[in-house]
């Protein structure tokens, strides 16, 4: 909000704690919910960002959540998720994870993105 003072920012989180402790500048536009049923109209946002959250969803929520991100975005999207490329990184992720539910390789994430028709940018985070 400080970088783009004329912007309209909204957020959704599954954590009541995160909503209650959100930044004062946007707190009134944060809602409790899950990405598989976003309350905004089609093409509502100029930019949709999901950072380190999709891997916290159960596998059965991934497809709908990715489709919802696609639906509410006019064009620009970015997401970042946890992933692993080998057994060591998978073990590191398993030991680290507290809320991670979707453990996917890069190829598996790409499969989910393609299945959902997700055409935005993304990055994968690894525990080396």
How should these model regions be labeled?
Residues 73:
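Glycine-rich S-adenosyl-L-methionine
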Residues 40:
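Carboxylate-rich, divalent-cation-coordinating active-site regions
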Residues 53:
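Conserved sequence/active-site signature of Rossmann-fold short-chain dehydrogenase/reductase
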Residues 49:
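A conserved beta-strand element that flanks and buttresses the S-adenosyl-L-methionine
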Residues 45-46:
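Local beta-strand N-terminus motif with an aromatic residue
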Residues 1-37, 57-64, 68, 76-128:
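Class I (Rossmann-like) S-adenosyl-L-methionine-dependent methyltransferase catalytic domain
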């Amino acid at each position: 909000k400080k970088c783009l003072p004329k912007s309209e920012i909204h957020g959704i989180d599954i954590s009541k704690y995160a909503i209650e402790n959100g930044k004062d500048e946007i707190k009134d536009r944060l809602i409790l919910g899950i990405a598989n049923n976003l309350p905004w109209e089609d093409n509502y946002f100029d930019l949709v960002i999901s950072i380190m959250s999709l891997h916290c969803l159960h596998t059965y929520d991934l497809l709908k959540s990715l489709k919802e991100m696609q639906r509410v975005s006019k064009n620009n999207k970015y997401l970042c998720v946890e992933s692993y490329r080998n057994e060591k990184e998978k073990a590191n992720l398993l030991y680290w994870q507290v809320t991670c539910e979707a453990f996917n390789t890069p190829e598996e994430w790409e499969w989910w993105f393609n299945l959902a028709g997700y055409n935005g940018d993304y990055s994968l985070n690894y525990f080396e």
